[in-house]
Amino acid sequence: MAAALSQGGTAITMKALLEAGVHFGHQTKRWNPKMKPFIFGARNGIYIIDLQKTVGLARNALRFVSDSVAKGGSVLFVGTKKQAQDAIREEASRSGQFFVTNRWLGGTLTNFKTVKQGIDRLKTIEKMAADGTYERLPKKEVAQLEREREKLEKNLGGIKELSRLPSALFVIDTKKEHIAVHEANRLGIPVVAVVDTNCDPEGIDYVIPGNDDAIRSIRLFTGKVAEACIEGKGRYSAWVAEHGGHDERREQEDRDAASERGHKDRRDRRDRRGGPRERREPREDRAAASANVEVVRKGEVAPAAAPEAAPAKE
């Protein structure tokens, strides 16, 4: 597996990183101390990223991406900043993956069922335009549908064919895309990201220290991740063909992931309540207590816990 990556289009070299300006971080006054382990030093008030670490970490990240896709998974590319949009859109499309480039809609992952309704609506309008329905509608209604379609396409076009949650996220600029990272963390979806010196690496499963502002740097890493997806997809296709087209591995992974998300959601709810729920009394004890209350209510006996009246003082 490692050999395939090192010899193919996913190869990461020091020369390529230097030429793309990957080593240039942010000004020293705009840094996140948690990025200190990935910083080589400072020059002219700008932090220089340790490219030796970038090379090793990028290779690990690409290996993970390739293996995830080889198991039948998918990768969601996320980059809404202007200089990242074109690269994210082009490379995700080239590798047959999914992307978000306009803005991250809150709940894209954590409330995927609702987002799926928007996707279904987009497909319905597209079908209406293709099957001639538009021709039977008033022009005003067609114009309204087109405006709705354009808005949905802008926000959901990149995930239109996403039928289930992705196996991984690839993110450019984790500071800007912190909501996407948070949602992935909540669901246990691994995050691969290019992390600059002003970002927080916590919550990122595969940190790639590097410049997340320069277009050449963004294109370099986005292209490498796309190549890893293509390589993994080839292995997946070969595996499915060999096993008669039935993907038991992916089905089992879906079940395991759903189970893990369920456990995590229950733990989160318990933590928000302030700890585990108090143990309830056994059913027999609750029934007995209920009977005692009913007896007291009818006046048959006095409450056992009722204190005696205090004697009057002289």
From Swiss-Prot:
InterPro entries: Ribosomal_uS2, Ribosomal_uS2_bac/mit/plastid, Ribosomal_uS2_CS, Ribosomal_uS2_flav_dom_sf. Keywords: Ribonucleoprotein, Ribosomal protein. Residues 302-314 have a biased composition (Low complexity). Gene3D superfamilies: Glucose-6-phosphate isomerase like protein, domain 1 (3.40.50.10490), Helix hairpin bin (1.10.287.610). GO terms for biological process: translation. Residues 244-265, 271-287 have a biased composition (Basic and acidic residues). Residues 244-314 are annotated as: Disordered. GO terms for molecular function: structural constituent of ribosome. Coiled coil: none annotated. GO terms for cellular component: cytosolic small ribosomal subunit. NCBIfam families: rpsB_bact. Belongs to the universal ribosomal protein uS2 family. This is Small ribosomal subunit protein uS2. It comes from Anaeromyxobacter dehalogenans (strain 2CP-C). The lineage of its organism: Bacteria, Pseudomonadati, Myxococcota, Myxococcia, Myxococcales.
